[in-house]
Structures are given as structure tokens and as C-alpha cells.
């Protein structure tokens, strides 16, 4: 079972006491890479400090919500049956979280919709313990020429999740996440 650092602000959060952190560092989990970073948009896109969590069963959004609130980021949970394309266009999120193997709109479909919207949008894909799903995430990233996909077996440790969110905020020019 994962341990929370002593004297951290997460120490008393019951949710985190039941989360086992992924032992592989996030940097090593970066899927694919080496793409040219091209996007259908000219110049960097200004995004909102908003994360879309595509999930049908509330599995990872409660833990992410705690961190997002602490960082001043809005988290919106959307079901996998909702049309994601208009939502991406209207709300301009700084990142999308999804599960690769969900019952409705699986992670591969979410990645396809993200690629049609903005190939540079950071996507955190949870693959579970099935190694073939990691391979599927790598293949989809390569085929769709996505540049911001990070695949994890389960929700990353707190520090890595904060790092992912700050990186997404910088890329999306979310000024509320930038230091003073």
C-alpha cells in the first residue's frame, strides 16, 4: 500500500491512504515521442485552467479533484458517452484524463477526438495492469501524432500528478498556474 509523505497536506486525506502509487516514475512512462509538435492551430493555444476527466464510474476524479482544488484548477467529470469534440472546443481544457479501457468512449477514441482538436493537448491515459493496453496507447499516439500523451497503469503519485498539471498549465498558457 502506498505511503503518503509525513507532514504533507495529503496525510489526513482518506482517499490517498487507499491509493497505491505507480512504482515507475512518470518520466519513464512517457508514451512515444519525437513528433514535430505540429498542430492545426497557428501558435500556442490559450487554454483554461480546466481538466476534463472522462470516466463513467467515479474512480480517479476524487483524488484528482483534491489536487486541482489546491492548485486552483477546475475539474469537470464527463461520461464517456458524451460528445467530447464540442466540449473541447468550447471549454479549451489544459488537459484530459481518461481510461484506455472504459465501457463507453474508450481512451483510444478520446485520443482521436483530442488529435482532431489539438495534437499538443496533454492527455493522461490510465491503462490498468494489462501490458497490451500500454502498447495500444503507444500505437494510438504514434498514429494520431499526439505530442502530450502520458500513459500510467494507475493514477500517478501526488508529486508527479502536480508536475503533469503544472506542465499542462504552462503549455496551455494558464496564467493562474504561473508563479507570481
Language model region names:
Residues 1-61, 65-66, 156-180:
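Non-catalytic signal-transmission and effector/linker regions of two-component phosphorelay proteins
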Residues 56, 126-130, 154:
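Conserved active-site segment of CheY-like receiver
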Residues 66-70, 87, 140:
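Alpha-helical interaction/dimerization surfaces of two-component signaling modules
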Residues 77-95:
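Acidic, metal-coordinating helix/loop segments flanking the phosphotransfer/catalytic sites
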Residues 87-90, 113, 164:
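CheY-like receiver
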Residues 92, 117-124, 147-148:
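His-Asp phosphorelay/catalytic-motif detector in bacterial-type signaling
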Residues 97-120, 127-136:
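Conserved phosphotransfer microenvironments
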Residues 107, 138-150:
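As written
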